[in-house]
Design a protein with these regions (language model features):
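N-terminal intrinsically disordered, cationic/polar leader segments
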Residues: 1-218
């Protein structure tokens, strides 16, 4: 055969602690790996990939802004001064609707390059509004909800964050390494779900990020 492929799917148990009570719990992360070898006249060409799917929580920025505008009108009507209103919104983010987010990240590289699975999992978790846990005490629950509402993100925001974090964590990878990013947010107030994805080489992502930085400076 001129081409050989091996593919693996598995479930990876991650030990975690809740943010306030430090209760130990576990999370199941879906992981997969693939290797493809092609025969050549010299050494075989091997490409490999590793990826994971992680579940988290997102909070909608749009609905939150609507609720903030409403709350601001009420506070102004009660003659609350602007400084106090700003301080209130800093400490107490407004209500919004939430989604259960499913992030997917896969990186394909040459055989001689290493991609740390734990970094992939961390990138996925950190790219959503907040992480979720199997077991939460009351203090933990309040912390998670507050963290999510202080960090609202659209589905496309999650994909952008993953791309930026990949470049930060895996800056040593060759430019032809291929990054596949997907995010699905299961909507709570819509009949549909929100979805975004991006597939690009490391070199393409670097060019895109440099373009964003140039535009921000102008």
């Amino acid at each position: 055969a001129d081409r050989t492929e091996v593919f693996m799917r598995s479930e990876f148990m991650v030990k975690r602690e809740t943010p306030v009570s430090h209760t130990v719990c576990h999370e199941v992360v879906k992981v997969h790996a693939r290797a493809i070898a092609r025969r050549t006249f010299r050494e075989p060409i091997v490409r490999k990939s590793i990826g994971a799917e992680v579940t988290g929580m997102t909070a909608c920025p749009c609905a939150q802004n609507i609720m903030k505008e409403r709350a601001m009108r009420v506070l102004q009507g009660l003659n609350v001064d602007k400084h106090s209103i700003d301080a209130f919104f800093t400490e107490v983010p407004m209500a919004t609707h939430n989604q259960r987010g499913k992030g997917f990240l896969c990186i394909e590289t040459d055989d001689d390059q290493h991609v740390d699975l734990s970094k992939i999992i961390s990138i996925l978790k950190d790219s959503m509004s907040a992480g979720i846990y199997e077991l939460l005490k009351r203090g933990d629950e309040g912390h998670v909800v507050l963290a999510a509402h202080k960090n609202p993100r659209f589905v496309e925001d999650c994909v952008r964050q993953m791309a930026k974090k990949v470049l930060s964590e895996f800056e040593y990878l060759s430019g032809d390494s291929v990054v596949t990013i997907k995010q699905t947010n299961e909507e709570s107030i819509h009949q549909h779900d929100a979805y975004a994805e991006r597939t690009a080489t490391i070199a393409e992502l670097v060019d895109e990020m440099n373009g964003e930085n140039r535009n921000a400076d102008e």
